[in-house]
Amino acid sequence: MLLRGVLLALQALQLAGALDLPAGSCAFEESTCGFDSVLASLPWILNEEGHYIYVDTSFGKQGEKAVLLSPDLQAEEWSCLRLVYQITTSSESLSDPSQLNLYMRFEDESFDRLLWSAKEPSDSWLIASLDLQNSSKKFKILIEGVLGQGNTASIALFEIKMTTGYCIECDFEENHLCGFVNRWNPNVNWFVGGGSIRNVHSILPQDHTFKSELGHYMYVDSVYVKHFQEVAQLISPLTTAPMAGCLSFYYQIQQGNDNVFSLYTRDVAGLYEEIWKADRPGNAAWNLAEVEFSAPYPMEVIFEVAFNGPKGGYVALDDISFSPVHCQNQTELLFSAVEASCNFEQDLCNFYQDKEGPGWTRVKVKPNMYRAGDHTTGLGYYLLANTKFTSQPGYIGRLYGPSLPGNLQYCLRFHYAIYGFLKMSDTLAVYIFEENHVVQEKIWSVLESPRGVWMQAEITFKKPMPTKVVFMSLCKSFWDCGLVALDDITIQLGSCSSSEKLPPPPGECTFEQDECTFTQEKRNRSSWHRRRGETPTSYTGPKGDHTTGVGYYMYIEASHMVYGQKARLLSRPLRGVSGKHCLTFFYHMYGGGTGLLSVYLKKEEDSEESLLWRRRGEQSISWLRALIEYSCERQHQIIFEAIRGVSIRSDIAIDDVKFQAGPCGEMEDTTQQSSGYSEDLNEIEY
């Protein structure tokens, strides 16, 4: 099933002292080292000759899973988890290959955290590197193989290794090279030097680690360069946890005038940034380089050498290390996402206005059938510009954010709503104010906005100097002006598009891509439906989703149902843990005939369901937040049940469901409102 040629390389890869591997590690030579198959899934099978463990796909069906669970682990120091694996495929399964997922399971959480996923088939072994932040909490590693199409494909694990340290560190003494890879070039590439490897064209150095011919390092030589500006790149594993500090390494350069040795970072969006360049050849010995390195979001480090011709000599690299302590004479650029964000529930946070007079007013509107509330909870505060207290011809309202350090990439997200403007030009715009140059640059302005819908905007920006974000609303004439609402401003490090390429947060569902892990007892016209935009029936249902205003939500279409008919949406089975759970979600109940929305807890092996929360009748034209705190130490499911009311104006919707470990930080008023008819609504099963 597996390519036998892979085994020869693996025997060199696996450590001779496999039995002494640290906790959380296994070379699968004679045992699975405490990693066990979960009985309710397909088994992982240890190869008779050792070397690897695999999933037998010959009898499995597409979509079936094989789950491997580690013993209890603890990472009190920063650790690196490396996985050597292979996914093979057949010609019939190219469109739907098998998949390998790696999760982290904490003892006090009902959901597993997806750390990594891969489904790229390969004819040789591959390596994945994952940074694990230090934590006092115990956890398990869960490895899940999902079968693709065809029964000749395979999923195999050759080694799992968990060691103290950072995945970006490497001395190049092991065959897997710590997950560093060379970007292949026909003429110039990075090679392993030292040991028994010798190059006849250049006099290469001894390695730095052992300072002998027994050690290894990486080098790139110009002897095969055929063109000017030939480039060789050595690419590190992608960082998977935020880190900042001092990145150090040793290097040697021969004939430095004919080559350029540089260090870059590259994020998941493909954006490069040069963070270091060798300014002189250095001496004949190994030279130490220390570089201030910050990876608040996933990125790779790229060691790049550019040659100007075949006489450019060589560049050698060894002993890459990282320390969370910053380099000499360097200080960390302090940035706090919390201090740079605001939902205006308590005050303006670190935002402020022009001294000439307040243009933005912090308001709280009790939502009803005619007025929408804030975006955060539906019942809280937001900012309003062009109110009756500020609106005047030529009025300009400016809201300044806190100072942001320069030379960092930021993602700005906020929600806004526009009411009553005849023209959208300059209704709301965002500027970047460079403090040192007193220059403002417009980076966004509203083009169109449906009335009464909270819309999300997201902007990625980066400036070399310290900056501030400025929200500006302009009222050119009294007759053209309406209201501008602003809420839930967040500023985070990294590109806004980065989140699309990261694993989704555990226990969260926005319904943007699909229904997540929710299922339905019955799926027909009277079921829960995933939708974007307005619902078909007027005077009921939301105009847009809660997440972005233009995304998806789940709802029942009352015109397809009869009075008392119900639809049920079930979560996947959740692990029972000790302590409190907090379930939050947003619900929309607008329409004169609105029925009931209930949330139930169903415990494993119990026929009865416990009611956790309920709302009945028309609530508001707004999305409202619900918080439910509950406890359950047994496996269980959460059920969202919507019941159609007395008329077709009974659409009910939910969005942005989130499960969290621990108690809810705040609890809303649990007073239930009544629409005047029976609570059970003559429930009908269909």
From Swiss-Prot:
GO cellular component term of the entry, any = extracellular region
How is the polypeptide modified once translated? Answer: O-glycosylated.
Q: Which domain of life is it from?
A: Eukaryota
Chief site of localization: secreted
Q: Name one Pfam family in it.
A: MAM
The UniProt record lists the MAM domain at: 24-169, 168-329, 340-498, 507-666
Protein name as it appears in the record: MAM domain-containing protein 2
Where does the protein end up?
Secreted, Extracellular space, Extracellular matrix
Extent of the signal sequence: 1-18
Is Acetylation given among the entry's keywords? no
On whether Cytoplasm is a keyword of this UniProt record, the answer is: no
State which residues carry a glycan (glycosylated): 134, 329, 524
Source organism per entry reads: Homo sapiens
Cited Gene3D superfamilies:
2.60.120.200
State the UniProt keywords alphabetically.
Extracellular matrix, Glycoprotein, Repeat, Secreted, Signal
Q: Where is this region: Disordered?
A: 521-543, 665-686
Gene that encodes it: MAMDC2
